[in-house]
């Protein structure tokens, strides 16, 4: 599954194989619990879990309908490859129908899926399941003859189904992932030879009788016929051992181990005709010592069995009698190791079936052991049965008792009641339990804490007194009493302090040097004065306000008019070509042009800085001084008002002609019209 490490690929694979999976507690596919939980992923998993619950319910309904269709045909033929049995009568030796296991071991698919209709049983205290590559399914075909002996001498496959019940990380089937859920339904093999106290499972063979001698192996254990069969179930972390005892025969050695069959809550279907586990899987381990008796029965199981199964002493097989077909099969070959499956459901076990063990005569292909016959007596229930407590953790998974029995002897399909009007079979249901909700992440907790702190600060101060955030501590500035503005920035009164002495600088002179703020004393005596500006006029350090003009720095007291000596801080000023500073009034008085007519300086009008003057013959005139000297006509550029100078005098055209008629001087004749 390396290629499905990526959650996206694994989700895509799950969608493709949707019908191969069942919903589980962990969700739809594997989730890395160590990784941080993604809220989007959790929401997606919940949505898929809801959909899978609906799909699972539909599948359960379809299986229930299929079971209802199968029940009426139970008396006409075998169900799911089961044997068709004759009328309920005790058979003589060699006259019963024999259950034959044909085919060889075949490794299961990668998904290890078991067809619906097969009941998988596990026993407490038995070995773990085999590896997946060695698993095989055993399908048993029964004889179609109801009252005659098949006479089949074919070699039978000895099989056994048992599993140790050891605590695992999660014993609830809803806790298993989809792949593990089916893998854990794999086949198991006991370790008899190593541990004589291990409860043997169910074994099936031909050519074996009942033996009371040591070294014999118990064979298939059959439950007594009872129309009220119940589904044995167990919960996670606890188990109830369903065990039955068998009184010894004349040989006194027919003691059996606790059967301890646990029936899973999942119904599987198996198809007849598939190969079963063969002897190529290895020789069957045999016990060298007789089994010590051990009796246990489920709670409230006190009534005697209503029917007993006779045993055969001819060595040709085990005989099964009953009015309804009851196909029996052990779907697990014998292996030593493998994964364990811990499956649980909610209803307590109340099956009155008695389990007894017959011993296998020989491996497939071998004849029956001589002298291993023993008259069979029907199984009985021990009143002094040991009851193991069971705790149900999933009460919602319980099904109605008495409706059907999930075979505790490893048989295929549900055990059908022997009455013609059998009740409906209700399949066990399994609900999807969503995973626990994960708490908020560290980033969410930090964001929530910051938000709450900001809300507390906003609630502690009126919103009208909020000025903004301090550039030094980034906290809000509330109230004018602690607000300080300097260099265009907002500070707390306690944040705007001298970098050297930490004194508050609100309302005091400060010096900003290299990104730090200093008070005047620290600035003067800490060596920073070397970087201070010097006045352009006096040449001294500027320790107070700095006035910059024309690219130079001045003390405010040094920046004065050279004429009136008035301080020009905040007052319009001008300079001449010699860099002398003048106020505007003195500048015009000193540097303003003089009128050629009246000889006075031409100054700007009151309230204005602009000077209006008339320039004629390279001379400057006031506007009111530029007129005809004879008639006083205002001269300008209009027609009839043009100036006609004569001998450096200003005249209009008529006055100019008159001056010429009187005999102008030769100098006046050379005048040109302007």
Curated annotation (Swiss-Prot):
Residues 470-674 are annotated as: Necessary for nuclear localization. Residues 402-440 are annotated as: Interaction with RB1. Coiled coil: none annotated. The keyword Disulfide bond does not apply. Residues 98-109, 344-371 have a biased composition (Low complexity). It is found in: Cytoplasm; Nucleus; Cytoplasm, P-body; Cell junction, Adherens junction. One of its GO terms (molecular function) is transcription corepressor activity. Phosphorylated during mitosis. It comes from the Eukaryota. Its main location: cytoplasm. Residues 54-136 are annotated as: Mediates nuclear export. InterPro entries: Ajuba-like, Ajuba-like_LIM1, Ajuba-like_LIM2, Ajuba-like_LIM3, Znf_LIM. Residues 73-109, 142-165, 204-388 are annotated as: Disordered. Residues 468-529, 533-593, 594-662 form the LIM zinc-binding domain. Keywords: Cell junction, Cytoplasm, LIM domain, Metal-binding, Nucleus, Phosphoprotein, Repeat, Repressor, RNA-mediated gene silencing, Transcription, Transcription regulation, Tumor suppressor, Zinc. GO terms for biological process: cell migration; cytoskeleton organization; miRNA-mediated gene silencing by inhibition of translation; negative regulation of canonical Wnt signaling pathway; negative regulation of DNA-templated transcription; negative regulation of hippo signaling; negative regulation of osteoblast differentiation; osteoblast development. Residues 188-259 are annotated as: Interaction with EGLN1/PHD2. One of its GO terms (cellular component) is adherens junction. Belongs to the zyxin/ajuba family. PANTHER family: LIM DOMAIN-CONTAINING PROTEIN 1 (PTHR24219:SF3), LIM DOMAIN-CONTAINING PROTEIN JUB (PTHR24219). This is LIM domain-containing protein 1.
């Amino acid at each position: 599954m390396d290629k499905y490490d990526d959650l996206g690929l694994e989700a895509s694979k799950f969608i493709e194989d949707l019908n191969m999976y069942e919903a589980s507690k962990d969700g739809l596919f594997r989730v890395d619990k160590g990784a941080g939980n993604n809220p989007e992923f959790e929401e997606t998993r919940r949505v898929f879990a809801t959909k899978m619950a609906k799909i699972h319910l539909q599948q359960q309904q379809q299986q229930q309908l299929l079971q209802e269709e199968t029940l009426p045909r139970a008396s006409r033929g075998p169900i799911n490859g089961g044997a068709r049995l004759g009328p309920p009568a005790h058979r003589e030796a060699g006259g019963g129908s024999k259950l034959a296991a044909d085919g060889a071991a075949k490794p299961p698919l990668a998904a290890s899926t078991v067809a619906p209709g097969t009941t998988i049983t596990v026993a407490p205290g038995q070995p773990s399941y085999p590896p997946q590559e060695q698993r095989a399914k055993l399908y048993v075909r029964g004889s179609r003859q109801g009252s005659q002996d098949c006479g089949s001498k074919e070699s039978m496959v000895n099989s056994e189904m048992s599993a140790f019940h050891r605590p695992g990380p999660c014993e609830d089937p809803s806790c298993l992932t989809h792949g593990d859920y089916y893998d854990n339904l794999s086949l198991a093999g006991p370790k008899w030879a190593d541990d004589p106290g291990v409860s043997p499972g169910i074994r099936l063979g031909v050519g074996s009788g009942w033996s009371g001698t040591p070294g014999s192996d118990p064979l298939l254990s059959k439950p007594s016929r009872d129309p009220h069969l119940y589904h044995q179930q167990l919960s996670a972390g606890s188990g109830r051992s369903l065990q039955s005892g068998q009184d010894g025969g004349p040989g006194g050695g027919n003691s059996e181990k606790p059967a301890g069959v646990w029936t899973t809550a999942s119904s599987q279907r198996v198809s007849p005709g598939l190969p079963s586990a063969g002897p190529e899987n290895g020789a069957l381990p045999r016990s060298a010592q007789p089994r010590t008796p051990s009796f246990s029965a489920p709670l409230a199981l006190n009534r005697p069995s209503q029917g007993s199964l006779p045993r055969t002493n001819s060595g040709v097989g085990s005989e099964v009698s009953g009015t309804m077909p009851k196909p029996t099969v052990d779907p697990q070959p014998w292996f030593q190791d493998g994964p364990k499956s811990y499956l649980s459901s909610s209803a307590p076990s109340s099956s009155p079936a008695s389990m007894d063990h017959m011993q296998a005569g020989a491996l497939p292909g071998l004849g029956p052991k001589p002298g291993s016959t023993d008259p069979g007596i029907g199984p009985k229930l021990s009143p002094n049965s040991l009851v193991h407590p069971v705790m149900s953790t999933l009460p919602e998974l319980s099904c109605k008792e008495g409706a059907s029995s999930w075979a505790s002897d490893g048989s295929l399909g549900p055990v059908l009641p022997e009455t013609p009007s059998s009740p409906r079979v209700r399949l066990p249901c399994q609900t999807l339990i969503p995973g626990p909700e994960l708490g908020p992440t560290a980033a969410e907790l930090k964001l929530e804490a910051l938000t709450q702190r900001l809300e507390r600060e906003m609630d502690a101060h009126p919103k009208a007194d909020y000025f903004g955030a301090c550039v030094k501590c980034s906290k809000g500035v509330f109230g004018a009493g602690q607000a300080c503005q300097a260099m265009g920035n907002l500070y707390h009164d306690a944040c705007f302090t001298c970098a050297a002495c930490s004194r508050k600088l609100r309302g005091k002179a400060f010096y900003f040097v290299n990104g730090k703020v200093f008070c005047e004393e620290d600035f003067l005596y800490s060596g920073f004065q070397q970087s201070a500006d010097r006045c352009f006029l006096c040449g001294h350090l500027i320790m107070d306000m700095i006035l910059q003009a024309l690219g130079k720095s001045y003390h405010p007291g040094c920046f004065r008019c050279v004429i009136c000596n008035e301080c020009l801080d905040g007052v319009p000023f001008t300079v001449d070509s010699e860099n002398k500073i003048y106020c505007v009034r003195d500048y015009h008085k000193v540097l303003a042009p003089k009128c050629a007519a009246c000889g006075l300086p031409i100054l700007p009008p009151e309230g204005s800085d602009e000077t209006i003057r008339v320039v004629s013959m390279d001379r400057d005139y006031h506007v009111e001084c530029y007129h005809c000297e004879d008639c006083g006509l205002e001269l300008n550029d209009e027609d009839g008002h043009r100036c006609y100078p004569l001998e450096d005098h200003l005249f209009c055209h008529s006055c100019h002609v008159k001056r010429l008629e009187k005999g102008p001087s030769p100098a006046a004749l050379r005048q040109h019209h302007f």
